[in-house]
Amino acid sequence: MATESTATAAIAAELVSADKVEDAPAPSTSADKMESLDVDSEAKKLLGLGQKHLVMGDIPAAVNAFQEAASLLGKKYGETANECGEAFFFYGKSLLELARMENGVLGNALEGVHVEEEEGEKTEDESLVENNDNVDEEAREELREQVYDAMGEKEAKKAEGQSLTKPETDKEQESEVEKGGREDMDISEPAEKLQEKVESTSKQLTESSEEAKEAAIPGLNEDEVTSGKTEQESLCTEEGKSISGVYVQNKEFREAVPQEEGEEMISLEKKPKETSEDQTIGAPEKQDTLMKVVEIEAEIDSEVKSVDVGGEEPKDQGAISESELGKAVLMQLSGQDVEVSPVVAAEAGSEVSEKPGQEITVLPNNGPVVGQSSAGDQTPSEPQNSAERLSETKDGASVEEVKAELVPEQEEAMPPVEESEAAGDGVETKVAQRATEKAPEDKFKIAANEETQERDEQMKEGEETEGSEEEDKENDKAEETTNESVLEKKTLQENEEEEIGNLELAWDMLDLAKIIFKRQETKEAQLYAAQAHLKLGEVSVESENYIQAVEEFQACLSLQEQYLEAHDRLLAETHYQLGLAYGYNSQYDEAVAQFGKSIDVIEKRMAVLLEQMKEAEGSFTEYEKEIEELKELLPEIREKIEDAKESQRSGNVAELALKATLVESSTSGFTPSGAGASVSMIASRKPTDGASSSNCVTDISHLVRKKRKPEEESPRKDDAKKAKPEPEVNGGSGDAVSSGNEVSENMEAEAENQAESQTTAEGTVDSAATVKSTAC
């Protein structure tokens, strides 16, 4: 059942589809016909418009019109269709004219280009530039103010960025301070809370001072320490000072707190100075010595601080040496009245060594606060300046300056140690000496470590920067090469596109039109083919391919002779173009012949027109106009004939001159011909004038003798040796020796004559000339 149902469903579907197909209307061809008619009519309109532009001299517009017509017909009928031949022919003809216009140096090459508009745009641009130059003074001042404001904002931003930047050591110190919980105090809190916090911090200081006292000097009493601390606190409270435990850096704190509150920063370096001053008020006799000690101690503290900021390991050693040194000096000089100062120094040294760069701020209750009390302000300004100078070295001075300042300060610190040795306190002085000896060594080690670390960092940064620079250079080179390759490809493509110029495109279009027209047997098509050959010849002339041009003109002439009369002007044009091609190809005889044939055709045409004028009735304006045109052509053609004849003559003369120069260059062997002539002259003169020639030879022999003396001596000796034994061999006696000597002399004279004759025969032209002069 299922199969039957599916089969019935399929049959029903087929029937429905068949009904639909039958009901569907048949496609109408009216739309296609309308489109074809529209294309043909549009192409004809474009062809007419192009011919109009061509006659009017608007070559670019004609090219566009013919191109559009050819594209329309080519899409509809195909490129090789008969309907496209005329469009391709005119398109190629217009392209040829456009190429001539572009290649013409003296022609109107700018025709069709809107030069006036470009000049107007240039004048507008120039006017804009002049307006910028003619700006008012007020506007200039406003611009200057804006520029200065922008520059000031940039400088302010730079200053803020520099102030906010911190070194790594300061960041580490701040982290340690935050861990210790000493930055909990707020500046905006009231004075009572600040005093409470000051009391708590003072208690902590007392506890730390007691511990330091027990560790450093077990013999001191706790009452003295506490009394010294209470006195210090009372002095601070009486003067209205509140010491905060906030430890911040100078620059950061000055930025955070406004200057209107009038606060001052008092560093830990001045703390032992204040305590020593307050405690030495009752002892005026030892004030000077104590001030020197305090100055030395403050300088050492600041130096330790400036050195400990860079390094981390030797902090404890610097603190111990500092505390012991202060303890020993103050115990020996000030006695029991100043026993608290070493403890304070120890506290200050320990705190400085543990947390360098931290300071104690003094906040007023009502108004600004002075750094020290008026009653106890007895210290001179020099220690303060020195301390401030050394504290400044902590921020920006180099390690070398600190080293230079350590040496005189150590020398100043040595006399109190020597006095302590004289007093008998040997143990403490030895400890102080060891501390003072170890401290500078540690400081120098720290400085050396800092220098090495800085150098390593600089080297690493330099290597990284060099590596990055090299990578950047390589990347830049790779990008440049890729860009250059892309540009080269683009330029090659553009050059290839540009190489397909108007002449080549015109050749293609005309060749295609020639093929289309030659395929047709009608007279009109064959004449179009002849015109295509003519234009192809002109394209060849423009591209300086004269042989191809001659072939194309001959093909055109053969077709025209078949279908045209003998007096047709097209024949005259073809003969003229063929004569030009022969002339360009240096075939002047053929050129003159073709120009003559062109004149004959024109004369025939004029005769025919005159006959038609006689036979015709009515106006003769058309005939007269054409006759005038033909008469104007004749002088030009005759001038071409004269030019061809003259060029033929000049060409013959040039050929003769060239042949003459070639012959002269080939036959002008200067040295061989001159030598031969001189030798012949010498040979002819020798038999006639023997005496003079012999005299001349003797004159030259003196010269040759001087030049070739070592070469001529050996043959003379050999000849003499050979001549001497001859009489003895022949059985001669002693008288024969004299005769042999005479014979040898004669032999030598003959040998000399032979050598001189050989030299004269083998001499150059110059030697021959000298022979002639000496002989005369």
Swiss-Prot record:
Keywords: Acetylation, Cell cycle, Coiled coil, Cytoplasm, DNA replication, Isopeptide bond, Nucleus, Phosphoprotein, Protein transport, Repeat, TPR repeat, Transport, Ubl conjugation. Residues 116-140, 408-422, 463-473 have a biased composition (Acidic residues). The modification N-acetylalanine is found at residue 2. Its main location: cytoplasm. It comes from the Eukaryota. It holds the Pfam family TPR_8. TPR repeats lie at residues 43-76, 530-563, 572-605. It comes from Rattus norvegicus (Rat). The lineage of its organism: Eukaryota, Metazoa, Chordata, Craniata, Vertebrata. There is a cross-link at residue 724 (Glycyl lysine isopeptide (Lys-Gly) (interchain with G-Cter in SUMO1)). This is Nuclear autoantigenic sperm protein. GO terms for molecular function: histone binding; histone chaperone activity. Residues 599-647 form a coiled coil. InterPro entries: NASP-like (IPR051730), Tetratricopeptide_SHNi-TPR_dom (IPR019544), TPR-like_helical_dom_sf (IPR011990), TPR_rpt (IPR019734). Residues 115-241, 256-289, 345-497, 685-776 are annotated as: Disordered. GO terms for cellular component: chromatin; cytoplasm; nucleoplasm; nucleus; protein-containing complex. Residues 116-127, 210-242, 457-500 are annotated as: Histone-binding. Gene3D superfamilies: Tetratricopeptide repeat domain. PROSITE patterns: TPR (PS50005), TPR_REGION (PS50293). It is found in: Cytoplasm; Nucleus. The modification N6-acetyllysine is found at residues 33, 241, 251, 286. PANTHER family: NUCLEAR AUTOANTIGENIC SPERM PROTEIN (PTHR15081:SF1), NUCLEAR AUTOANTIGENIC SPERM PROTEIN NASP -RELATED (PTHR15081). The modification Phosphoserine is found at residues 127, 175, 188, 242, 306, 321, 386, 398, 468, 485, 650, 693-694, 714, 733, 739, 744.
